[in-house]
Amino acid sequence: MFQDNPLLAQLKQQLHSQTPRAEGVVKATEKGFGFLEVDAQKSYFIPPPQMKKVMHGDRIIAVIHSEKERESAEPEELVEPFLTRFVGKVQGKNDRLAIVPDHPLLKDAIPCRAARGLNHEFKEGDWAVAEMRRHPLKGDRSFYAELTQYITFGDDHFVPWWVTLARHNLEKEAPDGVATEMLDEGLVRKDLTALDFVTIDSASTEDMDDALFAKALPDDKLQLIVAIADPTAWIAEGSKLDKAAKIRAFTNYLPGFNIPMLPRELSDDLCSLRANEVRPVLACRMTLSADGTIEDNIEFFAATIESKAKLVYDQVSDWLENTGDWQPESEAIAEQVRLLAQICQRRGEWRHNHALVFKDRPDYRFILGEKGEVLDIVAEPRRIANRIVEEAMIAANICAARVLRDKLGFGIYNVHMGFDPANADALAALLKTHGLHVDAEEVLTLDGFCKLRRELDAQPTGFLDSRIRRFQSFAEISTEPGPHFGLGLEAYATWTSPIRKYGDMINHRLLKAVIKGETATRPQDEITVQMAERRRLNRMAERDVGDWLYARFLKDKAGTDTRFAAEIVDISRGGMRVRLVDNGAIAFIPAPFLHAVRDELVCSQENGTVQIKGETVYKVTDVIDVTIAEVRMETRSIIARPVA
């Protein structure tokens, strides 16, 4: 009799609309209960039975119940699931399979089965890609997943690489395809094979994409020709190889190996500027005045060159610093190295005075054995030879940015707008508390930004610099010319790595149109979105593989007295993140390791400090000694403890 009662339906509707609800993200804990985080200030308790309906990270709408002054959340509706496609480890075998997601806060096994057409018999320990098919908040009885891809077996030494690439849905190998002959581009190539071009790279580099030639001119001027490998001489726009490169957008450099953007035949051979091999190039000739200014007579042209020597960073640096036993093979090569060092000196000074120079940070290199085991991790400081190449590339990219801007009005530009205007007042207020006075309007201009950066670089520590990083905007890829505040430049467009960056290939095609005096089509904005997304995924993949290898490397140091110098990189409510100076590993120091009495301890992310009893004991950028307390292999996390 109540079935179609309109009054009852109305009452139900009323009760539903009057019941308080909240939307937020589920945060799981190790203890079985969880929280619904609505915003930074507000969260609701989710009891263990209700947590069975949801997963950490799910965005949900929940009914809020109040009992005896205590509020709790009952999940009602799924807004966005945390898990859709994921990687994990298979449990069980044959017809009763489950998968445990590879995530620090997801511990429960999810029942699953292999997708139709997936011809692999899964067994305990296998790694797989899965997709969620059922969720309790969608009216299903339980969670359920489908295995869509077999990654590898549990004991594979190369699990860190294969699992990471599968997680981010990135390619595992070089693209297929061959380039049989050069295209007829209607370009006249200058024959520069007689000039003493050299390449400077790591000893193991195969994909050499830049060669340099320097010459002294009257009036204390120097000429530099930067010759860049020319893959667009082989790859037609819109061809199969071009489309594959467009999707990959970059060569993916992971510890131990890379996955190239172009077929290896091109990247490591046909396009690589190998010593004593004739190669087509796109070149830029520039004149530098005595103070390092790039004069206006910039010239881009197509050419053929023959590199006369493959030089190695450390050997060149040693020779210029009068150490080591390496010698250039001829006086002509020695003269090139001396002139290039002079150019580097001039350009470095010019950028220091008129733009911005990044602080040198070492690169960390993993030395791996046959089975992917980490034999060592070495810090490679940036030396004079690295800076020679860096200054030449930056100068060449400044030239391209100018030419594309003035001749076409578009290109693929790296743009960085400095500080977000919305943060300008907060930034000025923060700096004022540290005795630095800046004008909130001026700091949004390129000159104002550079002025502030120079003042920060002159500070005795990097503490203040670390405090203002959160006010900065992110660098972007744009088809419009625009300033790059981070480099202190009016415009910056890269074209010097076309073997490994698709954006540089686009700029090559545009520069060739300028050389031929032809009109060119503006690149579509979608390509910049794809490039930015791929750059983000590649960086995450590099970090994930690195975390895995660091955990492997430091595992036997856990619980020992081995000390490591560590720089504090971040402070949060839960503790501090530090970077080990010798090898670059990131470790976490939980708050209880800093001080036993929680009420006397204040860890402030806002101030970048740790205070004990009101006294600042640690701050971001401090270097402290730590030992490794624990390495958790399943989450690839390293827990450290300060040395008392």
Curated annotation (Swiss-Prot):
Keywords for the protein's UniProt record, in alphabetical order: Cytoplasm, Exonuclease, Hydrolase, Nuclease, RNA-binding
NCBIfam families in UniProt: 3_prime_RNase, PRK05054.1, RNase_B
GO biological-process terms attached to the record: mRNA catabolic process
Gene: rnb
Any GO CC annotation of this UniProt entry: cytosol
Every RNB domain range: 189-516
Compartmental location: Cytoplasm
EC number(s) reported in the record: 3.1.13.1
Phylogenetic placement of the source organism: Bacteria, Pseudomonadati, Pseudomonadota, Gammaproteobacteria, Enterobacterales
Name this polypeptide is given: Exoribonuclease 2
Source species of the chain: Escherichia coli O157:H7
Family: Belongs to the RNR ribonuclease family. RNase II subfamily.
Domain S1 motif: residue ranges: 561-643
HAMAP family documented for this protein: RNase_II
GO MF, any single term: exoribonuclease II activity
Pfam families (alphabetical): OB_RNB (PF08206), RNB (PF00773), S1 (PF00575)
Primary role: Involved in mRNA degradation. Hydrolyzes single-stranded polyribonucleotides processively in the 3' to 5' direction.
